[in-house]
Regions:
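Bacterial N-terminal signal peptides that target proteins for export
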Residues: 1-11
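C-terminal motif of bacterial Sec signal peptides marking the signal peptidase cleavage site
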Residues: 17-20
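All-alpha RGS (Regulator of G-protein Signaling) helical domain and cognate RGS-like helical scaffolds
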Residues: 23-197
Length: 197
């Protein structure tokens, strides 16, 4: 039985509040300022290209994790209760993170990634359309094993992306989210690995 930690939800709510407050005063008209990651006030909302890329790439990465979680919750695939509980936990964690990153891109006057572009599938841990279709053909224990294996790779990809923005990014809000993603997903990987034992 997995227990969903309420702390990440409170943390995300706090970040959303900070983002909303920052968006009221932050002027994004000077894109040369944004590209250097500084603004006139040197405020919390300062960001650079690495922060933008992190949000643009992590949103579809999270969206695919939620798609995989929805598959596990589909009763026709007969996933185990352990898998279904973890899938629900993943959805609960990543849905608000998508909202947060989308709000950042809006505040920064930056676009979402074009999901029609083929390169989005090259992100670390992302499954191809064919791989997702193949997963959907499995049921029961076979589905559990394949799902856990896919989700471990997917989580490791997200952790790698978080590590990159921690090295290259500037926004302290992005840094905080990257730390949270690493913490959440490392914990979930440990659970997923036990499912493979």
């Amino acid at each position: 039985m997995f227990r969903t930690n309420r702390l990440p939800k409170l943390f995300i709510a706090g970040l959303l509040l900070l983002a909303a407050c920052g968006s009221e005063s932050h002027n994004m008209s000077d894109m040369s300022t944004a590209s250097t990651g500084t603004d006139a006030a040197g405020s919390e909302s300062s960001f650079n290209d690495a922060d933008v890329m992190f949000a643009q790439m992590m949103i579809p990465h999270h969206e695919q994790a939620i798609e995989l979680a929805d598959m596990a919750l589909d009763p026709t695939l007969k996933a185990s209760e352990q898998v279904k509980t973890l899938a629900a936990q993943i959805k609960s964690a990543q849905d608000p993170e998508i909202d947060l990153m989308t709000q950042w891109l809006t505040d920064w006057d930056q676009p979402l990634m074009d999901m029609s572009e083929e390169h989005d599938m090259s992100m670390d841990g992302m499954l191809s359309v064919d791989e997702i279709a193949a997963l959907g053909e499995l049921t029961g224990a076979e589905f559990d094993q394949a799902w856990a294996t896919a989700m471990i790779a997917h989580h490791k990809g997200a952790i790698k992306m978080a590590e990159t923005v921690k090295d290259d990014g500037q926004s302290t809000l992005v840094q905080d989210l990257a730390n949270l993603i690493m913490q959440e997903q490392q914990s979930e990987i440990a659970v997923l690995e036990k499912l493979l034992d």
